[in-house]
Structures are given as structure tokens and as C-alpha cells.
Amino acid sequence: MDLLLINGPNLNLVGKREPSIYGSQTLEDIQEELLTLANELGANLKFFQSNSEGEMIDCIQNSVGSIDGILINAGAYTHTSIALRDALLGVAIPYVEVHLSNIYSREEFRHKSFLSDKALGLVCGFGANSYQLALEGIVSYLKRV
């Protein structure tokens, strides 16, 4: 089972940017923990991070035929990008939306997601553990289909 975790804009700053909201673990630390968990779950996990919407779309499109499931934290693009939504729908790869913070307990403009209604699920608000929960969820789903 091959999985891809896509992180969007500013997530390269996790651990440094607003730690009271996003936590103190760096993206590299989170990814290291996820690799261990993925291995335990029998999954291969690849990582991609970009601040560019176009690069994220290219990554999604290039995943066809090589990736069984996607975990995506689109960052601020969650609330603005119909293009990311269209890319995810276009490749028809199951995906789980992930956020470190609870987007529904923050500013009103963060309450709208262009991704969640078509996702297998949405995990938010558990800090770095959101990624682990999302990983466990998508692996469980893919083992059943």
C-alpha cells in the first residue's frame, strides 16, 4: 500500500510558526514519526510539501497509478482552492483531509473547506496526532476495499 502525504503552504514552518496553534514539533519530526507508524501498519509513505498551489496539483496528478491513498493538509488552500479539489476528484484517489488545528474553532473564513465533502474523512484539532489518526484511518479503509 503506497500513500502520499501532501502538505501545503507554510507547513514547512510548523514548529516555528505560531506554536500555540500548530504545536512545537517540526514537520520533519512529524514525518519521522509517521514513517514509523506507516511501517508498523504495512504501508509505504511518501512526503511532499509546497507553498505553490500548482506544484501541489502536479504532485496529485503525477500520483495516478503509483499511489493508493492521499493524506492532505492543504493549509490555507483548503479554504480557497477549487483547483486542488478538482485535481483530487480528477485522479479519483481516496484522500483524507488533515489539519493540526481545529479549523472550526478558529476564524470564520477557515470554516469553509473545498476538500472535506469529497474526502473519506477529516481529522483536525489534535495537533501532530491528527496526521497519525488520518494515517490509521486511510490504511484501515484501504485494507477493507
UniProtKB/Swiss-Prot annotation:
Reaction equation(s) it catalyzes: 3-dehydroquinate = 3-dehydroshikimate + H2O
Keywords: Amino-acid biosynthesis, Aromatic amino acid biosynthesis, Lyase
Pathway membership, UniProt: Metabolic intermediate biosynthesis; chorismate biosynthesis; chorismate from D-erythrose 4-phosphate and phosphoenolpyruvate: step 3/7
Keyword Heme included in the entry's annotation: no
CDD domains in the record: DHQase_II
Binding sites annotated in the UniProt record for substrate: 73, 79, 86, 100-101, 110
GO molecular function: 3-dehydroquinate dehydratase activity
Subunit and interaction comment: Homododecamer.
Reported function: Catalyzes a trans-dehydration via an enolate intermediate.
Family, per entry: Belongs to the type-II 3-dehydroquinase family.
The name this protein goes by in its record: 3-dehydroquinate dehydratase
Organism: Prochlorococcus marinus (strain NATL1A)
Taxonomic path: Bacteria, Bacillati, Cyanobacteriota, Cyanophyceae, Synechococcales
